[in-house]
A protein has these predicted regions:
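Short, well-ordered beta-strand elements
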Residues: 22-31, 52-57, 79-80, 126, ...
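Extracytoplasmic "Venus flytrap"
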Residues: 24-40, 59, 133, 375-379
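Short, polar/charged alpha-helical segment
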Residues: 32-53, 387, 405
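Extracytoplasmic/periplasmic substrate-recognition and gating elements
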Residues: 47-48, 147, 224-228, 268-337
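Hinge/lid segment of periplasmic solute-binding proteins
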Residues: 84-134
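Glycine-centered hinge/linker elements that transmit conformational signals in sensory
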Residues: 165-166, 204-237, 267, 281
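Mature extracytoplasmic/periplasmic domains
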Residues: 261-264, 300-381
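C-terminal capping/gating helix-and-loop segments adjacent to ligand/active sites or protein-protein/ligand interfaces
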Residues: 355-413
Length: 420
């Protein structure tokens, strides 16, 4: 087994062109230790499958978002990859169905298989959902205790959390009351909780309605008055992703809205520096208290020279025993229904991490049907990008909120026309 960190030059050039007929390239990004764990379990796979060599190319997440689609369009992509644009890359996917037990896959992965499909009528098997995620807040409980402020309880609203986090920050001199990752996916749950529908009556994607506008107004206002850590959104251009995990880890941030994939990182890097916990997504004026589901999956690409070998690798990772091991070692929520029903004994997880994963799993019941539909919508990547770019322009003052919303509408119309 070989695990490699790709340089910028290698990313631009692509990772295709295997040196031998037995070599497969697996483009992988990690939220925590996922690529390291895959490298380890695939070493065992190689021992059982002489002549197959799976090289794990570790890349930044931004490379998955930006470089991989370019490589695939040029025909220079890897054999398989860990992706998050599940439906958006469907045109490049290898259909695993001819090579795997479809009954096992359908019973094990259920509805998540639809997130990778082209749409109604497509029954192909394209991706193994490797980690189920849900967005939600991490809270610095130590800062609340030091401030003598009671933490809002179940069913608390975004306004109540903003007021409490601000009070805590002022009492403790913490740098930032709140932050939300710079991501269209991350703000979708809050927007839905404010009443955003995200689809029109015909089921086509739409961004701007009264609910979305209400959230946009409030989010921009919070960035202007210091409730939100402004530089998370204002410090980047275009639709570039930016999280605020380090600010939270450093103890500078009271309330951090991100997601379950961060649990392993928090467990490892916060340690006993302070007490942290996960709470349910706050509620909005529309009565919803929704996060966004999502996650990552491992897919093969039709341009590979070795489709049967690629399918064999992914099928191995999808086996219940291997999937359960990877889930336990990476501290992720399982999308495999058999693994989920059996329960996961998370490896070396602290009490805080175990409680956090339990809290995230429990909050899945509060996820709006709109959020599940949005996650599976093939046009969501364009909508995420438009959201980030135009909201950021409103935050930095390049546009008013009204102008930003107008641009979102025209941007989405153009994107949908281009995709036809």
């Amino acid at each position: 087994m070989n695990i490699k960190l790709l340089t910028t030059t290698a990313l631009i050039a692509g990772v295709a062109g295997a040196a031998s007929a037995q070599e497969l390239r697996f483009m992988c990004y990690s939220d925590g230790n996922e690529c390291e764990v895959y490298d380890d379990v695939l070493t065992r796979f190689e021992a059982e499958n002489e002549g197959l060599d799976v090289i794990v190319d570790v890349v930044p997440y931004q490379a998955i978002l930006e470089n991989l689609p370019v490589q695939l369009a040029d025909g220079t992509g890897p054999d398989l990859a860990k992706v998050t644009d599940l439906g958006g890359l469907n045109e490049y996917y290898l259909d695993l169905a001819p090579y795997v037990d479809a009954d096992y896959w359908n019973s094990s992965f259920g509805e998540t298989l639809n997130w990778y499909r082209a749409g109604e009528g497509d029954e192909g098997i394209y991706g193994m959902h490797s980690q189920l995620t849900i967005t939600g807040p991490f809270v610095n409980a130590t800062l609340f205790e030091q401030a003598g402020v009671e933490m809002p309880g179940a069913g608390a609203t975004w306004d109540e959390w903003a007021a409490a986090a601000t009070e805590v920050a002022e009492a403790t001199d913490a740098d930032f009351p709140m932050a939300i990752d710079r991501s269209g996916h991350r703000v979708a749950g809050p927007a839905i909780s404010y009443g955003a529908q995200l689809f029109d009556a015909e089921g086509n994607g739409q961004l701007v309605d009264d609910g979305f506008a209400a959230f946009a107004e409030q989010f921009v206002a919070w960035n202007e008055d210091g409730t939100m850590a402004r530089d998370v959104w204002a410090g980047q251009g275009g639709s570039t992703y930016q999280d605020a995990a380090q600010e939270f880890i450093n103890g500078e941030l009271v309330f951090y809205y991100s997601g379950s994939w961060q649990v392993g990182r928090m467990d490892e890097q916060v340690g006993d520096f302070f007490d942290w916990q996960v709470v349910g997504s706050p509620c909005g004026p529309a009565g919803a208290c929704s996060g966004m589901p999502g996650g990552a999956g491992i897919v093969g690409f039709a341009q590979t020279e070795h489709p049967e070998a690629v399918a064999k690798v992914i099928d191995y990772l999808a086996s219940e025993e291997v999937y359960a091991e990877v889930t336990a070692r990476t501290k992720n929520l399982p999308a495999h229904l058999g693994v989920a029903s059996a329960g996961v004994d998370f490896e070396d997880a602290s009490p805080a991490a175990s409680a956090a994963l339990t809290a995230f799993a429990a909050d899945l019941a509060n996820v709006s049907p709109i959020a599940f539909a949005y996650q599976g919508y093939a046009g969501n990547r364009a909508m995420f990008g438009i959201t980030v770019e135009r909201l950021s322009q409103a935050i930095v003052g390049e546009l008013t909120v009204a102008e930003a919303l107008e641009r979102m509408t025209s941007d989405l119309e153009a994107a949908m026309a281009e995709s036809q």
